[in-house]
């Protein structure tokens, strides 16, 4: 990908980067195990971003 990106695309990539993290353990404890994993998790090789 080019170094010079449109700002809107850069913001979308940054949002996807932040969303690609596991949920904190305290959320699992707070929800008593109802929320166990992040469904938005993706691997950079396997899944494609529609940005």
UniProtKB/Swiss-Prot annotation:
GO terms for cellular component: cytosolic large ribosomal subunit. The keyword Protease does not apply. Pfam families: Ribosomal_L39 (PF00832). Signal peptide: none annotated. Disulfide bonds: none annotated. Keywords: Ribonucleoprotein, Ribosomal protein. Belongs to the eukaryotic ribosomal protein eL39 family. This is Large ribosomal subunit protein eL39.
